[in-house]
């Protein structure tokens, strides 16, 4: 069981993610990105071994409320998992680029290829996932391992030392057929 603070980037998928996590017996506290950073930091300080999950959301990570400041404050201090917009914010924080992907996807099932390591160990390869995005990460800095891709587009990154990872795809979507199992593996990875 994990103690999770989920930062809601005002996305319609947020509570699908909350339900998926709670159905696997994780304790989940939800705060919107419009809440002041200090309030969220105070809550995290009272949690035992917290994990921060950055939800999907609209727009660019620079305009996602307190998320960029939280990332800078918490990097290396606790495990952080970013999904879609959260993933983009992680890559940007490390110095990568976030830009238009050339297409707008809203509910596209894709087969991604992965490195079969860490959270992907033992997962089918290619792995069917759901993609909902128009932005994509590139120019990934050396501190991040690109551990999944689709047609040369980055679909997942991780930093094993700082226990930070991000996914462009949505594990909480029904189109990610093994999404619940994958999310469980990610949470286990944060504890290794």
Swiss-Prot record:
One of its GO terms (cellular component) is cytosol. One of its GO terms (biological process) is phenazine biosynthetic process. The keyword ATP-binding does not apply. InterPro entries: Anth_synth/Amidotransfase, Class_I_gatase-like, GATASE, TrpG/PapA_dom. Heterotetramer consisting of two non-identical subunits: a beta subunit (TrpG) and a large alpha subunit (TrpE). It comes from the Bacteria. Part of a heterotetrameric complex that catalyzes the two-step biosynthesis of anthranilate, an intermediate in the biosynthesis of L-tryptophan. In the first step, the glutamine-binding beta subunit (TrpG) of anthranilate synthase (AS) provides the glutamine amidotransferase activity which generates ammonia as a substrate that, along with chorismate, is used in the second step, catalyzed by the large alpha subunit of AS (TrpE) to produce anthranilate. In the absence of TrpG, TrpE can synthesize anthranilate directly from chorismate and high concentrations of ammonia. The active site is at 84 (nucleophile), 170 (for gatase activity), 172 (for gatase activity). L-glutamine binds at residues 57-59, 88, 134-135. It catalyses: chorismate + L-glutamine = anthranilate + pyruvate + L-glutamate + H(+). This is Anthranilate synthase component 2. The lineage of its organism: Bacteria, Pseudomonadati, Pseudomonadota, Gammaproteobacteria, Enterobacterales. Pathway: Amino-acid biosynthesis; L-tryptophan biosynthesis; L-tryptophan from chorismate: step 1/5. Keywords: Amino-acid biosynthesis, Aromatic amino acid biosynthesis, Glutamine amidotransferase, Lyase, Tryptophan biosynthesis. Pfam families: GATase. The keyword Transferase does not apply. GO terms for molecular function: anthranilate phosphoribosyltransferase activity; anthranilate synthase activity. Residues 3-192 form the Glutamine amidotransferase type-1 domain.
């Amino acid at each position: 069981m994990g103690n999770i603070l989920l930062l809601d980037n005002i996305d319609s998928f947020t509570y699908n993610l909350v339900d998926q996590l709670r159905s696997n017996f994780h304790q989940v506290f939800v705060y919107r990105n419009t809440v002041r950073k200090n309030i969220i930091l105070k809550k995290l300080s009272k949690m035992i071994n917290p994990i921060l999950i950055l939800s999907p959301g609209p727009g660019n990570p620079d305009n996602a409320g307190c998320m960029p400041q939280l990332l800078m404050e918490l990097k290396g201090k606790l495990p952080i998992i970013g999904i879609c917009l959260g993933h983009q914010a992680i890559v940007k924080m490390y110095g990568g680029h976030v830009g238009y992907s050339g297409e707008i996807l809203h509910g596209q099932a894709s087969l991604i290829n992965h490195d079969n390591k860490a959270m992907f160990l033992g997962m089918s390869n290619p792995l069917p996932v759901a993609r909902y995005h128009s932005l994509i990460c590139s120019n990934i800095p050396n501190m991040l391992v690109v551990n999944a891709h689709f047609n040369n587009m980055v679909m997942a990154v991780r930093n094993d030392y700082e226990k930070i990872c991000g996914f462009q795809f949505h594990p909480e979507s029904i189109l990610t057929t093994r999404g619940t199992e994958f999310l469980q593996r990610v949470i286990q990875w944060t504890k290794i």
